[in-house]
Amino acid sequence: MMDRIEKVILRNLVYNEEYLRKVLPFIEPDYFNDRNERVVFEHITKYASEYNSLITKEVLQIEIEDRRDITQDEVKNIYGTINELEDIECDFEWLSDTTEKWCRDRAIYLALMESIKIADGQDDKKNRDAIPTILSDALSVSFNRNVGHDYLEDYEERYELYNKKESRIQF
């Protein structure tokens, strides 16, 4: 059986702490189409921010059971989603790159859908001037946190660059 990327992401958010710490700040609940997966993700996020550790499947099930805004049938479906999460090894670099691409694709898709609603006049809160900002924010989704210079860590490279002797060509 082939897993969807959403399932792979949820699985690794439950079992892979390094992955959780790297990607969790960039994933939004709206990126998940399936309500069951969205609910599971919300509980993973809540637990990680509250306890600063990985959640277990048992804790997830207990947390879901305590919710009052979902029906018993939805609880059963969410339990099914949770039970499908198994600890399967994945290459970390591939997983990070694929998750970043998925986040960017979902952000762009959702931004386009929101832009269409605004253009059709279905959104009373935003006008057409908001569309470029919405699309720009979606296009800028990236896991790269290396923005600018780190003056303490990059000093050797900068020193070499500043003091590099360039060969000059005479006219």
Give the location of each predicted region.
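Noncatalytic partner-interaction/assembly domains of nucleic-acid and motor enzyme complexes
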Residues: 1-102
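The Walker A/P-loop phosphate-binding site
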Residues: 11, 142-171
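Short, surface-exposed, charged/polar-biased interaction segments
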Residues: 30, 44, 61, 81, ...
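Short, flexible helix-adjacent loops and helix caps
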Residues: 49-52, 120, 164
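Intrinsically disordered, low-complexity boundary segments flanking structured domains
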Residues: 65-68, 82-85, 136-143, 156-160
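Interdomain "pre-motor" coupling segment immediately N-terminal to P-loop NTPase/helicase cores
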Residues: 86-152
